[in-house]
Amino acid sequence: AIRRRLLEGAPAVDYPEELIRYQQGMGRLSGGGLYRLSVDGGEGCAAAEYTDGESVLFKELLLSPDKMGRGLAALERVLPGARCYVRTPALWDGMKGSYLQPFGMIKWYSAEKRALWGEGTHGYMGLGFD
């Protein structure tokens, strides 16, 4: 419910409940999971997995851009790691010293649907199940 509300109106992949639960299980296997955040009155959510013994992959972090830094700091207290990778919609410039890297792609097999998408539109894949 939180995820859908935060992505409402954005071009994003909408996952059914069973896939969200699948992600929850995958996260737990590695020591992560699904998280609900409250930062300065703003609500958010995250899906995290440990990729190895010291790196955390936030497969999704949804929070308003002005609260991302504080949200990550709160998550780091629960999920410590030497390094973290964070996937967010294309609305956040990242942390100081970080770099941005596109994730996922879309290939249209229908010219009609491609025309509806619009040039320059940034979609959000989210969890990705990689």
Where are these regions (language model features)?
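Amide-forming acyltransferase catalytic core, primarily the GNAT-like/NAT-type
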Residues: 1-67
